[in-house]
Amino acid sequence: MKTRLGLVYGGKSAEHNVSLQTALAVTKALDTEKFDIHPIYITEKGEWVRGPQLTEPVSNVKMLQFEQTGQTFSPAVLNRDMFPGEADAKEDSIDVVFPLLHGPNGEDGTIQGMLELLNVPYVGNGVLASSAGMDKVVMKHLFAQAGLDQAKYVSFLKKTWSQSKEECYAQVEGELGYPCFVKPANLGSSVGISKCRSREELDQAFELAFQYDRKIVVEEGVIGREIELGVLGNDEPVCSVAGEIAPKKDFYDYKAKYEDGDTDLIIPASLTEDEYETMRSMAVKAFQAIDGSGLVRADFFLTNEGRVLINEVNTMPGFTPFSMFPLLWKQSGVEYAELIEKLVALAIERHEEKQQIKHTF
């Protein structure tokens, strides 16, 4: 019997287009002998629109946008058990949901919470891990509690900054110095990130970052290599080989990731056995610190002095075939289609485990 897999993508997020690219790649890779593929598009206005079941790959993202041709529906009908005896609801129901959403409302625990309430199995991290992994400040606090070495940072609220800009800038200069990186606390794909070398650039960077979030984080500039590992699993996570990001630009921004191709991905990264083992151990600890499940990509700095610093974990990493996470697993012996199937299996495993939990006493 085939698995009815709901692909949820798009969303009210600055990473809407990234999500569309991910959905396109996944639809091309899925085996229609194993899965009934049901596309569910969230428009930029936040409307849920369901398209027809996909029986063959689509060629471009426009074919996955159903504002004009799809059927608006309530996500509540994803669970057939909530609508016993209703034929339409049963037809709409899904066995497993794969949220292919990046950024706020998709990667931050929001949709995960909805799916938990509906008791629908879903791929990837749960509410806690997703929200902690989205908020860079909370994430860094958890890493510190877990004893993971990381770069120095400070964080600011927009209200604090608007009332005392000069004091904020002085704190950055006093505690971190230049260069430093300014980032929205709750956004990915390098959206809204700036590298600063002066007070003037710092002011511009704060202005930009606060357009995307009410909270930002400023990190010290680290001189060294950027290394990433993929983590896969639930309670017994395993790691992929390591990969290195070698941007041809000053840093790995949104354009370098998704538009220009001005970045070399070196897989496997050239590391000593001790360096890899340190990163592997830290990646697992970071995964466990946020209570991860399914997948994360763990990002590290390897300084010129040989110090390993964890930068962040991404709970829904870029997932196109040319993204780092799938490429890491391909080099580790897991092809793209198999990776998707493993993630679906992990989602079902976790859901079945949760069903054994008692809710009465």
Swiss-Prot record:
GO terms for biological process: cell wall organization; peptidoglycan biosynthetic process; regulation of cell shape. GO terms for cellular component: cytosol. It catalyses: 2 D-alanine + ATP = D-alanyl-D-alanine + ADP + phosphate + H(+). It is found in: Cytoplasm. The keyword Mitochondrion does not apply. Keywords: ATP-binding, Cell shape, Cell wall biogenesis/degradation, Cytoplasm, Ligase, Magnesium, Manganese, Metal-binding, Nucleotide-binding, Peptidoglycan synthesis. Its EC number is 6.3.2.4. GO terms for molecular function: ATP binding; D-alanine-D-alanine ligase activity; metal ion binding. Its cofactor is Mg(2+); Mn(2+). Mg(2+) 1 binds at D299, E312. Its main location: cytoplasm. Pfam families: Dala_Dala_lig_C (PF07478), Dala_Dala_lig_N (PF01820). ATP binds at residues 173-228. Residues 140-345 form the ATP-grasp domain. Binds 2 magnesium or manganese ions per subunit. It comes from the Bacteria. The keyword Transmembrane does not apply. Pathway: Cell wall biogenesis; peptidoglycan biosynthesis. Mg(2+) 2 binds at E312, N314. Belongs to the D-alanine--D-alanine ligase family. Cell wall formation. HAMAP family: Dala_Dala_lig (MF_00047). This is D-alanine--D-alanine ligase.
